[in-house]
Regions:
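Active-site and donor-binding regions of nucleotide-sugar-utilizing enzymes
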Residues: 5-27, 31-180
């Protein structure tokens, strides 16, 4: 909602590269035969948990990585560690239809990856519209989110599209995701 946009700008840090947040990613090189992976790691914690996987992916010359984040500290870490190694890095677009659709038209990924407990309904919707596989790595459900998803089939439908692949961190989390 406009309220959250206002809060982001007022709070500081989140207004950094606002054009990314409204889907206006910079000119991204034309799509080649290489596979393009869009990785969304919200903050320093998610980016750190993804480091080994990301470093391995970056060694493959047939892959192009678009790396996005949400927090100012996560974006700073992404810039410090991956600038020049990924195709593009910057803020994740706000999860609203127009912004997401615009970002997707520019990024054109072959796979999307999110980390931990981040559920981005519009991002996942855009993936399903385009037949792009979506993957959550280190997937976790808090007690509250688990309870809400168990109670609401609408929430499950909006947040968990068909074909979403989920890699969990424990047997308990695996059981929770399976139940949902």
């Amino acid at each position: 909602s406009p309220y959250f946009l206002y809060r982001m700008l007022r709070r500081g840090g989140y207004g950094f590269k606002l054009y990314y947040r409204i889907g206006l990613f910079p000119i991204i090189p034309k799509k080649t035969d290489n596979k393009r992976i869009w990785i969304q790691a919200v903050s320093v914690g998610e980016l750190s948990s993804l480091a080994k996987i990301l470093d391995t992916l970056l060694q493959d010359p047939d892959l192009e990585i678009v790396l996005t984040g949400t927090t100012s500290t996560g974006l700073r870490m992404a810039s410090d560690k991956y600038k020049g190694r990924v195709l593009v890095h910057g803020p994740f677009p706000l999860d609203w239809f127009w912004f997401s659709r615009l970002a997707w038209s520019r990024v054109r990924p072959d796979l999307i990856i999110t980390v931990d407990s981040e559920l981005w309904p519009e991002h996942f919707y855009q993936a399903s519209l385009r037949g792009v596989p979506a993957l959550i790595i280190n997937a976790r459900l808090s007690d509250n989110t688990f309870a809400r998803l168990c109670r609401s089939s609408l929430a499950r439908k909006l947040l968990l599209p068909k074909g979403l692949e989920i890699l969990t961190t424990s047997e308990r989390q695996c059981a929770r995701w399976s139940e949902v």
